[in-house]
Design a protein with these regions (language model features):
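Ala/Thr-enriched low-complexity intrinsically disordered regions
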Residues: 238-241, 251
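An alpha-helical interface "stripe"
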Residues: 1-216, 247-252
Length: 252
């Protein structure tokens, strides 16, 4: 198996996302080609299905038209974000995540670029993931530069207004001595990459004295249980003995 970003990062990421509940949509299949809105990369059928389930009396196409209109505003996506959260229509069920439709695809092009992985929630491409080959010297650094140039390009305005978060990963653990290694996230219009890393490593091992105390308590509980069982056995034996004596007395 070749050692590259596809085998070491992209495929493992897709497999992990599948375990989380994302359905994979192939984009290179002529038979099952997704019904895409070419201006936004919104999955029209998925959006309609999810919208009509969450809003049985509303029209999905009217909502889609409103979304597309807001995505063209020069407001860095603010209007679309407000519609996503505060619309009279329910675009995403934030209270019951299982009511939403989760899908993913790989290498779905938009204008002049092509994210490695795109995540859809109710048909909306809200998350993009860029993967880099592990131990590549300029991998994440180059992606920071590309990300900045990408959102500065006017032809990507709609796509950047729609995307809520970008993820970048080389599938390597955090290393404080290697600032460009690991997993990062960023907003569409931000050149700042934030790390995914544990803020604190917690030592949850109790001190020796506490361990001894816990062991003693467990032993005491076991002893009490054994004593109770012995008492119950004795009571049962006593009852059986009394029954035998009664039977013997009646027989004689």
């Amino acid at each position: 198996m070749p050692y590259n970003e596809i085998t070491r990062v992209q495929i493992p990421a897709l497999m992990h996302l599948a375990k989380l509940g994302y359905d994979f949509i192939p984009t290179n299949s002529k038979e099952n080609k997704p019904n895409l809105d070419t201006d936004t990369n919104i999955l029209i059928d998925s959006f309609t299905q999810a919208f009509e389930r969450l809003n049985p009396t509303k029209n999905a196409q009217d909502s889609l038209a409103e979304i597309k209109k807001r995505l063209n505003y020069d407001d860095l996506g603010k209007s679309f974000y407000e519609y996503l959260l505060k619309s009279e229509h329910q675009i995403i069920d934030f209270d019951n995540p299982n009511n939403n439709l989760y899908e993913m695809t790989a290498e779905l092009p938009y204008k002049s670029f092509r994210p490695d992985i795109t995540l859809f929630i109710n048909g909306l491409p809200l998350v993009n993931i860029e993967v880099k080959q592990p131990f590549a010297e300029q991998g994440i650094k180059e992606e920071k530069f590309r990300h900045t140039k990408r959102y500065e390009n006017p032809e990507n305005k709609v796509f950047c207004n729609l995307a809520q978060i970008w993820l970048f990963s080389d599938n390597l653990p955090y290393d404080e001595n290697k600032p460009d290694q690991g997993a990062f996230y960023s907003a569409s219009y931000s050149p700042i990459f934030q790390r995914f890393v544990e803020a604190h490593k917690l030592d949850i091992t109790p001190p020796p004295q506490k361990i001894i105390k816990i062991i003693k308590i467990i032993k005491i509980i076991k002893i009490i249980k054994i004593i109770k069982i012995i008492k119950i056995i004795k009571i049962i034996k006593t009852i059986k003995t009394i029954d035998r004596l009664k039977k013997f007395k009646n027989a004689s």
